């Protein structure tokens, strides 16, 4: 299903992620002027700054960002402001430990990382609503702010949630969906392995199974509860839909607050494609357009055994999937240097020409806002090995020159803004089968192999391909523009989707289905 996109860029726009709270105030004006000299028009700020805005509960401080906004005004720099809810302050998690996510074994996450919270904690939602509203009240009317980003990388790192609040919310979700325990028992096939429930209190979140504990698999981290366990797959599938709904509700809450205070010409977005999240519904209900993070250099990661047969071209697949959510999407984080936390994701610095190549790759797939990550190389914390455009020495360098030249070249491409992809081939996807492939080893293997093979064939034959997400509300006309549609392995398929596919084939389209289609 395609999303209508209300917000449109009038020109290709370039930005950089900037963290004024991490740098001395004396550097700010010079940094913004150097960015502008390179063609950068926008800075993205605010993510992970909750403790700056609210150092103690109910005590708010806007001094740092007030000064920064005055500096931005002085230099003429535009701003994308990010809500800081991805990293709660220490006072919050210490005072209200019920906001913390847990492993499946019941161990609470602690303070010191990020994304350690659960969407379903009433207290966390309450405190998030307060900080988002205070920031929106303060900066929402400011004409320098062209847009707002909600949180940062929803469902990244943690896309499973096991707190008491999550268990209670899961039961509410199931009661709303099934109404009765008999209906749930039938839908989950609970007669298999004697899993029938007689009271709602017996229904729990996905748990550690004997096969997992014996194999010593994911029981320690408590994440990745899919095909590595012997848990009821129908229960897992509903759980993933529950996580999706919880995340989207969290995003919607923030969007509703922002809409009350920000200017009508300012956009709302969020970034990244991460597990157990229906980006189409989230974008349709809460955002003006979807944004993606693109790090093609991770194809060359030094600490990963994963193979990318087409190397950095692999990111064309992810960009095409982002285009399926928003035809004219944004890039919140475009790789500009070597990447790496101190613990993982170590990847080398882009070779000469690769920043230009990767930027053009994003633009070619429909991105109209490109925000490089980051302006300055980090010199503290977990991201200490994550390089930006500038190195630690603060001098002009090869990457800055390449960014400048790339942006100048993109200025010659303005006629493509608002253009439409004209692929003749599409790959059909849906979230039910995406989630199910995590619960079923056979489905997952088939899906991974076929999806990669179709992508490689498309790339080496220079045949552009779109991704089309099907729902029961999709219209057959959405497929008519494609001569061929691949629907790799839709193990789960509804009668309404069968009718959509039948109409497509009867209209002359070629449909390619994979093994196990419709088996569930």
Language-model segment annotations:
Residues 13-25, 46-65, 110-129, 154-159, ...:
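The substrate-binding groove and active-site-proximal loops of carbohydrate-active enzymes
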Residues 22-37, 128-134, 272-283, 351-359, ...:
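Short, acidic/polar
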Residues 29-38, 42-109, 136, 254-262, ...:
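Aromatic-lined substrate-binding rim segments of carbohydrate-active enzymes
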Residues 9-14, 39-41, 73-79, 141-146, ...:
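Short, well-ordered coil/turn segments that N-cap beta-strands
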Residues 200-206, 215-219, 223, 264, ...:
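Carbohydrate-binding surfaces of carbohydrate-active enzymes
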Residues 2-27, 32-42:
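An acidic-aromatic substrate-binding cleft motif
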Residues 16, 35, 43, 72, ...:
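Conserved, mostly hydrophobic/aromatic
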Residues 105-317:
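Polysaccharide-binding and catalytic clefts of secreted carbohydrate-active enzymes
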């Amino acid at each position: 299903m395609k999303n209508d996109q209300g917000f449109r860029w009038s020109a290709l726009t370039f930005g950089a992620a900037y963290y004024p709270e991490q740098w001395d105030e004396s550097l700010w004006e010079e940094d913004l002027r150097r960015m502008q000299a390179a063609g950068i028009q926008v800075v993205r700020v605010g993510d992970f700054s909750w403790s700056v805005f609210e150092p103690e509960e109910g005590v708010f401080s806007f001094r740092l960002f007030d000064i920064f906004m005055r500096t931005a005004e002085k230099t003429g720099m535009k701003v994308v402001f990010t809500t800081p809810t991805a990293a709660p302050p220490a006072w919050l998690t210490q005072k209200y430990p019920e906001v913390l996510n847990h492993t499946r074994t019941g161990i609470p996450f602690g303070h010191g990382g990020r994304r350690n919270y659960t969407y379903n904690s009433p207290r966390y939602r309450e405190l998030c609503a307060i900080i988002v509203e205070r920031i929106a009240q303060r900066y929402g009317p400011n004409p320098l702010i062209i847009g707002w980003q909600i949180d940062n990388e929803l469902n990244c790192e943690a896309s499973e949630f096991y707190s008491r609040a999550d268990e209670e919310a899961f039961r509410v979700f199931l009661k709303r969906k099934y109404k009765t325990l008999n209906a749930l028992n039938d839908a989950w096939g609970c007669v298999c392995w004697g899993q029938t429930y007689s009271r709602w209190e017996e229904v729990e979140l996905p748990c550690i199974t004997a096969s997992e504990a014996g194999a010593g698999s994911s029981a320690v981290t408590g994440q990745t509860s899919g095909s590595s366990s012997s848990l009821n797959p129908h229960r897992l599938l509903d759980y993933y839909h529950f996580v999706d709904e919880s995340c989207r509700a969290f995003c919607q809450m923030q969007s509703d607050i922002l809409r009350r205070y920000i200017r009508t010409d300012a956009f709302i977005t969020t970034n990244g494609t991460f597990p157990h999240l229906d980006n189409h519904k989230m974008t349709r209900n809460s955002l003006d357009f979807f944004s993606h993070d693109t790090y093609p250099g991770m194809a060359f990661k030094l600490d990963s055994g994963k193979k990318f047969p087409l190397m950095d071209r692999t990111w064309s697949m992810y960009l095409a999937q982002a285009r399926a959510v928003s035809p004219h999407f944004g890039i919140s984080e475009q790789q500009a240097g070597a990447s790496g936390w101190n613990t993982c994701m170590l990847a080398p610095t882009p070779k000469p020409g690769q920043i230009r190549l990767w930027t053009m790759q994003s633009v070619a797939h429909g991105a109209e806002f490109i925000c490089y990550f980051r302006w300055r190389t980090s010199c503290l914390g977990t991201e200490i090995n994550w390089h930006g455009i500038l190195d630690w020495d603060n001098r002009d360098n090869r990457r800055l020159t390449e960014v400048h030249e790339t942006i100048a070249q993109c200025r010659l491409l303005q006629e493509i803004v608002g253009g439409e992809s004209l692929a003749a081939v599409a790959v059909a996807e849906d979230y039910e089968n995406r989630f199910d492939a995590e619960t079923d080893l056979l489905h997952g293997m088939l899906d991974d192999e076929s999806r990669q093979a179709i992508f490689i064939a498309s790339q080496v034959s220079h045949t552009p391909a779109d991704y089309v997400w099907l729902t029961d509300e999709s219209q057959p006309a959405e497929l008519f523009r494609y001569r061929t549609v691949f629907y790799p392995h839709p193990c789960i398929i509804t009668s309404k989707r069968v009718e959509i596919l039948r109409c497509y084939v009867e209209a002359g389209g070629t449909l390619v289905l994979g093994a196990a289609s419709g088996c569930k």
